[in-house]
């Protein structure tokens, strides 16, 4: 866990710089694409405890960087009177949705085991990694907020 935290620290710093310089949508595009690539790579390449020392910080950098971007973006899309509620809603709704993924992972793993697939957990985790592609699709409807005033009532 600490290894991922080291990576996440640098990932969050990086996305804030990218979001400030190039815009929120390009920063999230890069972050979600990196999440997908790195997560699939790690699940399919991690072979030893030694690999974890460099792969887990990489995974933390990619997967947790988006939270630095959320801290910039979410307050910029809600008017003042709804800002706290809106930000809280965005952060916490996803937690409820994410709760479905561990049982889904185990279900996929069991299905793949029953089909005789080699390394079923890696395959199941790889399939679920494509959830990051949903983030890329969601960017189609995400407004760019860089350089715009905060919304007011």
PLM feature spans:
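Transmembrane-helix signature of 12-pass secondary carriers
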Residues: 1-153
């Amino acid at each position: 866990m600490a290894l991922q935290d080291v990576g996440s620290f640098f990932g969050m710093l990086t996305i804030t710089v990218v979001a400030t310089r190039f815009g929120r949508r390009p920063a999230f595009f890069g972050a979600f694409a990196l999440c997908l690539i790195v997560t699939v790579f790690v699940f399919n390449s991690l072979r030893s405890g030694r690999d974890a020392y460099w792969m887990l910080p990489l995974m933390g950098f990619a997967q947790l960087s988006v939270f630095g971007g959320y801290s910039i973006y979410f307050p910029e899309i809600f008017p003042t009177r709804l800002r706290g509620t809106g930000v809280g809603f965005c952060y916490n709704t996803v937690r409820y949705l994410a709760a479905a993924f561990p049982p889904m992972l185990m279900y996929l793993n069991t299905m793949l085991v029953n089909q005789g697939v080699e390394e079923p957990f890696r395959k199941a985790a790889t399939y679920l990694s494509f959830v990051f592609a949903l983030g890329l699709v969601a960017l189609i409807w995400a407004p760019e907020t860089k350089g715009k005033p905060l919304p007011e009532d």
